[in-house]
Amino acid sequence: KKVYDSCRSKECLRDIRVYLTRDAQELINAGGIASVKPREAELLCVSIDVERIQFNRGFYSVDIRFFYRIECEISCVIGRPRIVDGLAVFDKRVVLFGGEGGARIFSSQYIEDGRDVQLRPDSNKPTAVVEVVDPIMLDARVVAPETSCNCCCCALHEVPRSICSCFGGDDLVLSNDGYQLFVTLGQFSIIRLERDIQLLMPAYDVCLPRRDCSNSGVGGEQDPCEIFSSFDFPIDAFFPPQSDKAGCLFTGSAGVNDNRSGCSCGNNN
């Protein structure tokens, strides 16, 4: 595959709504919350949709939805701390160049002494690939109903069945009634458009995209997003370092050229 365009993203996702399980929602609705401690954020799934941009030939919009499992520790005025979990969702759109090829591809599967199986027709339209590392939990807070955001941007009306199964069958509360939990996450990702193409070319070391498609700003003093802005992009997480004995022209991060999504819960059952 040939990569036609790519970009990297280092984003601070501020105040993302967490849709809690029913038991967790009842806990925070009871009030008396003393503190909220962020514990863990796990990326469950990424949903990708690629569409051609009509007014700009060769360019495509890539709409991405990230699904996270969020775990926090809530301390109440009375009683011991409780662990709660829920679902957070973040939507992102980027525009990348993918070329104008539109060839139709027909292929078959070989059958000895029989008629070959005709495979489903395909095309060489670009494919979007999103590489992400698990996000970093930067902040968490519970907001009272009278001050929470009840706009449409916070509304989630439907959750894929495969995502719901990651919460042990517990129902997720999608309504905007009652107290709400918000978290701030730091996320690194690489997004690219690629096509199947017949080329013979030499292979070099890792190539980190030059373009930055982050769309989050930097907060104020002691802001979690400001802290996250000081983090280095984790190149080795996307491109595992090679052995020094490989004899390559470029090695490690010093040689960096700045130039099927499976929805599961991390088990192989």
For each feature predicted by the language model, list its residue ranges.
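Viral structural modules
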Residues: 1-269
